[in-house]
Amino acid sequence: MHHLWKIPRLFTLWGNEISCRTFHMNIKKLIPIQWGHQEAPAKFNFASDVIDHWASVEKAGKRSSGPALWWMNGSGKEIKWSFRELSEASKQTANVLSGACGLHRGDRVAVVLPRIPEWWLMILGCMRTGLVFMPGTIQMRSSDILYRLQASKARAIVAGDEVAQEVDAVAPDCSFLKIKLLVSENSREGWLNFKALLKEASTIHQCVETESRESAAIYFTSGTSGPPKMAEHSHCSLGIKAKMDAASWTGLSTSDIIWTISDTAWIMNILGAFLEPWVLGACIFVHLLPKFDSQTVLKVLSSYPINTLVGAPIIYRMLLQQDLSSYKFPHLHSCFSGGETLLPETLENWKAKTGLEIREIYGQTETGLICRVSRTMKVKPGYLGTAFAHYDVQVIDEQGNVLPPGKEGDIAIRVKPIWPIGMFSGYVDNPKKTQDNIRGDFWLMGDRGIKDPEGYFHFIGRSDDIINSSGYRIGPSEVENALMEHPAVSETAVISSPDPSRGEVVKAFVVLAPEFLSHDRDQLTKVLQEHVKSVTAPYKYPRKVEFVLDLPKTVTGKIERAKLRAKEWKTSGRA
């Protein structure tokens, strides 16, 4: 598929003078090419054009003395790296990958590591050598790893003790896999030891001059149906888009510290804990957090000079379960949330107990961030904010026509005739799947929504999750939001359920809070139904309620409504 590319307001991206707030390309080594009607660099590499730039700024004494990466493990160990130290260590990593590992430009490398400093080194090392990194979660089991290695034809995998045994169980079935690189203090048969090799590696490395549109990363999307798809991103769609986005939502300066709590396999991690802070010269804070612990997070926020917090809504909900009056956050001034629906109740409670707003960010693996509520924008409960300037985001109908404000439709990004910077390159080996997601001139986000007169987008629900009952279209998140306001509900998922008279009715799967487990279920069902009727339009109330111990989720924590829905309709004989 051929697409035209654009970078609006190119002059804002680079110039001739060093500034502590703006990264600048080395113009002499970049050859402008025409993408549509805009100029863009023919070559771009985040490691050399951003990290090495800030290392030079530090050397010139024009950046504050704060770290670029501040890591801790909760057991007293802390690591602080400046951009100069980060630059040198990532060059050593690049030498390990191209030297001892014998990997070549374009080879694909699975990186399955927890939140340890080596993850950041490995991604930068891959960038420097022109390798394609593929992040994966340490929650994967052998079957997950096997699928990813086989589908991607990965030449190498980088992993720790957490998954090494799982890798060894499937490696013989992966004919393309040649290198297993272990990040551990221990040794393991058949594996190279990264830490040992790093100590001996040179700090001198010539960064590969990667093409802007050259493949940089592959993310396996956590779809709720079918095998994961391989979403491919270029050096341009990751790095240059980060520069275009960062200042317009985080507002970070070189003296700021941002903490993004995310699994290393998620797109949010590379955006909020790698690309976007570093293009602005800010510090990234990382806590190992092998298991999420609300008290640990609150203590860190109270004790460390963290200015900006980014996390999924569930993180804020879990923090709110603690007594926040015992904590003070003297440095925290900005909170952002993305990845799932932010309940108005969560936003209101957080504001009441901390005095801070939670601002939504919205996007997907394929697009990166497309909407946000920036620090200078007003917060509207239930709204995702407005589109970034370089994305034309609209609500469209089933024919691909743009709908006026206030009309419900599919949230989509215009990709024709200009395929915008930041959009992924496509699904690897699956151009049909890429094309199937385009309606008219627009890329479908897979979400239903409404755009208001001010340009704010209101999320209604996933396109395939919408419930149509007696002619009423009901978004599951609206019902879930209502249920979550009741103290009996710890977690919930709402789907459609077959009904002989209405076609479909709303059904809620509910995980009860511990203190309500002994309550009469029939009575509790009635209480919850009446509660929903009291806080939202009565036609939305769940006519069916099923109490469960847990909900099916993907490895990245998303509730699999599709799995619940398939089981529900199959049981009825109407699947």
From Swiss-Prot:
ATP binds at residues 221-229, 360-365, 447, 462, 558. Its cofactor is Mg(2+); Mn(2+). It is an enzyme of class 6 (ligase). The keyword Transit peptide applies. GO terms for biological process: fatty acid metabolic process. Transmembrane segments: none annotated. Substrate binds at T365, R473. This is Acyl-coenzyme A synthetase ACSM2, mitochondrial. The lineage of its organism: Eukaryota, Metazoa, Chordata, Craniata, Vertebrata.
